[in-house]
């Protein structure tokens, strides 16, 4: 059969899959220690993003706003940047980095962010001679792209402005992309097992924050400014997600001769194998027996489920391109049929991704078609469910849950945001243990659906 890639036919958006660029840049920059991003736009551009971060991660984050109002939209909002930076520096004595994140309104009126940064830097040098607070621009016009584009812009801006050539440090850069804290923990685990000294860009493991006796309720990233500066001196860079850090990896290669490997996103057995081989290639470190055992456990667990429960089940997947394509590849490994892939970003490059060509080759040997829609929204999913009724399982974030509920289709929550199930951000989807968790989560969702519908639930008696 075939794989067809098409753009959403409607000009409008009904029930969007994603939010806008600034949200992605905000998620990237809060992964840096001693950093508070300043969102140059209306107050909602930070308030509602903080809300959705809190819903997903159940933590609080410091994200400032220049609180642009009507007068600033007419006369220019540069003074709001100045006031915002001065307030942050005065109130946070440990603050070392302030990314200035633009929005649709400030990009439209053409505020000179770089010029304002130069002006404020002179003020800071005079008023705070013993402090060094770096200001960097992050341009995220939210009338194009999505949170994926914004995350990539955020990481790229951090590295282009802070990376500094020095002595080789022997570290391996890992640009994680927009992943959960549980995924970062899994990345660190695998690197530790291989004995690799790594530079995690960006380390959000600390978003799984404890409640301490001092009642500190705010959460901070764990990547330091020095870590970002040292990325120029690494032995190599691996970007786990092509569209969420791939440009930063290419910049390090072009500007500082740091070898870069972009992808594949290590979801599933095959992609994790490739990731480990890439680590071995760049570092020379062997793959230890402990990871071979983890791989074997994952394969054993998935083999128990694949043919008996997963075979011929048709799956719809939506989310960011790297996650969706990675999940589709995983589905093929376990005999699930990914018949509908919805890429929420309007980046046309995703529609020409080489990984889709590989999926097309596999589709040629299958008995089903794979429909890929880029710049998609959740109405595409709802229409497919109602018109064809051929979806047995949905993989995606919580925004699509009502489609699953209304049409009585089992659903596994993956991606961002997931707020109607507890603790999912703690669980990895990458690596061998992530593959094992995905298999278990899919199976349990299907088992519960069988029980509620009284559909062959007797099979579970011997499970």
Swiss-Prot record:
UniProt-listed InterPro entries: ChlB/BchB/BchZ, Nase/OxRdtase_comp1, Nase_comp1_CS, Nase_VnfK
Q: Which GO terms describe its cellular component?
A: vanadium-iron nitrogenase complex
One Pfam family it belongs to = Oxidored_nitro
How does the cofactor bind to this protein, according to its record?
A: Binds 1 [8Fe-7S] cluster per heterodimer.
- Keyword entries, A-Z: ATP-binding, Iron, Iron-sulfur, Metal-binding, Nitrogen fixation, Nucleotide-binding, Oxidoreductase
- Origin superkingdom: Bacteria
A biological process from GO: nitrogen fixation
Cofactors that this protein relies on: [8Fe-7S] cluster
Return the broad EC class.
oxidoreductase
Q: Which reaction does it catalyse?
A: N2 + 8 reduced [2Fe-2S]-[ferredoxin] + 16 ATP + 16 H2O = H2 + 8 oxidized [2Fe-2S]-[ferredoxin] + 2 NH4(+) + 16 ADP + 16 phosphate + 6 H(+)
Q: Where does [8Fe-7S] cluster bind?
A: 20, 45, 104, 142
Task: Cite the GO molecular-function annotations of the record.
Answer: ATP binding; iron-sulfur cluster binding; metal ion binding; nitrogenase activity
Give the E.C. number(s).
Answer: 1.18.6.1
Family per record: Belongs to the NifD/NifK/NifE/NifN family.
Q: Subunit info?
A: Hexamer of two alpha, two beta, and two delta chains.
What this chain does, per the entry, is described as: This vanadium-iron protein is part of the nitrogenase complex that catalyzes the key enzymatic reactions in nitrogen fixation.
PANTHER family the record matches: LIGHT-INDEPENDENT PROTOCHLOROPHYLLIDE REDUCTASE SUBUNIT B (PTHR33712:SF7)
Protein name in the entry:
Nitrogenase vanadium-iron protein beta chain
Q: What organism is recorded for this protein?
A: Trichormus variabilis (strain ATCC 29413 / PCC 7937)
